[in-house]
Amino acid sequence: MKERIYPLLFSKNSENFSFNGCNFVVQKAREATARVVMWREFNLINSFTLETTFCGPTDGRYQDCHFTINILKECGRLFCKTLLDYASNEPKVREAIRELETMFPPQKAEEGLSQHFLPNNDDSRK
């Protein structure tokens, strides 16, 4: 479930990115893509393909509008902001993990994402 944290954070930062539109299943036709190879060979979980459509989003403030260069630049800016959040904003990451654990409950309490992704509760960075 770790691979879902960044996309969830990005969807909260950018109204033009849909977490619900994400597909985390590896399809047979995608087996040779760089992101799948990096995941399988090097256990790199944060390798994604970001796709957009010329036609624009189906909801939000840009609904039914074509994406412009400025909208795509804004998307890039928010992508970078989300990288910063992911790397250095522990409260936002904790909130995303709680939300993901609600959306996709772990089988056992000890298998929760926060047990494996976040520092121990006695971590001095609190």
Regions found by a protein language model. Name each.
Residues 1-126:
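Structured catalytic-domain cores with a bias toward divalent-metal coordination
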